[in-house]
């Protein structure tokens, strides 16, 4: 069935260069075919915060690129956003991008007092408090982090 929409891979390939020129990368593209008009969500992220003015500029660029496709419907909603504060840490780049930001961590068990310290993300590997540890303790075998959210 032809929905009149490009595939997720086509959108990522199409937008990757434009988003990279702005200093960011396309983290994900979600194409919602259940709504009318269709909804396309582009999630971008980078080492600097994706501010509103940058999102607005990217939205215009992304829209122009999508409108230039042959297989795009006449009407669609476009959302350009970032995972922002709810982003899970799933790779080293997420830790790097969170540098200097406050985080919430859930540790398995207790973190010994000699390894706890209040603080924000400093560098990959900091040790911290069970309520808000600094993130270099990840490699410490005595500390197992269950969940980390910026």
UniProtKB/Swiss-Prot annotation:
Family matches, as SUPFAM superfamilies: YhbC-like, N-terminal domain
Family matches, as Gene3D superfamilies: RimP-like superfamily, N-terminal (3.30.300.70)
UniProt xrefs under Pfam families: RimP_N
Protein name, entry field: Putative ribosome maturation factor RimP
Principal cellular location given in the protein's record: cytoplasm
Keywords: Cytoplasm, Ribosome biogenesis
Gene Ontology terms describing biological process: ribosomal small subunit assembly; translation
Residue stretches in coiled coil: none
Protein role: Required for maturation of 30S ribosomal subunits.
Organism: Mycobacterium leprae (strain TN)
Any single Gene Ontology cellular-component annotation: cytosol
Family in the record: Belongs to the RimP family.
UniProt subcellular location: Cytoplasm
């Amino acid at each position: 069935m032809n929905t009149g929409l490009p595939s997720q891979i086509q959108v990522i390939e199409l937008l990757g260069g434009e988003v990279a020129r702005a200093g960011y990368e396309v983290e994900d593209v979600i194409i919602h075919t259940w709504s009318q008009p269709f909804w396309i969500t582009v999630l971008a992220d980078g080492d600097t915060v994706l501010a509103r003015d940058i999102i607005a500029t990217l939205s215009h660029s992304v829209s122009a690129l999508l409108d230039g496709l042959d297989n795009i419907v006449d009407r669609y909603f476009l959302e350009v956003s970032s995972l922002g504060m709810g982003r899970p840490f799933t790779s080293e780049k997420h830790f790097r991008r969170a540098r200097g930001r406050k985080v919430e961590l859930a540790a398995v068990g207790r973190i010994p007092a000699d390894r706890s310290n209040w603080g924000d993300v400093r560098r990959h590997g900091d040790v911290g408090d069970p309520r808000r540890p600094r993130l270099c303790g990840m490699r410490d075998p005595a500390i197992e982090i269950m969940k980390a959210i910026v």
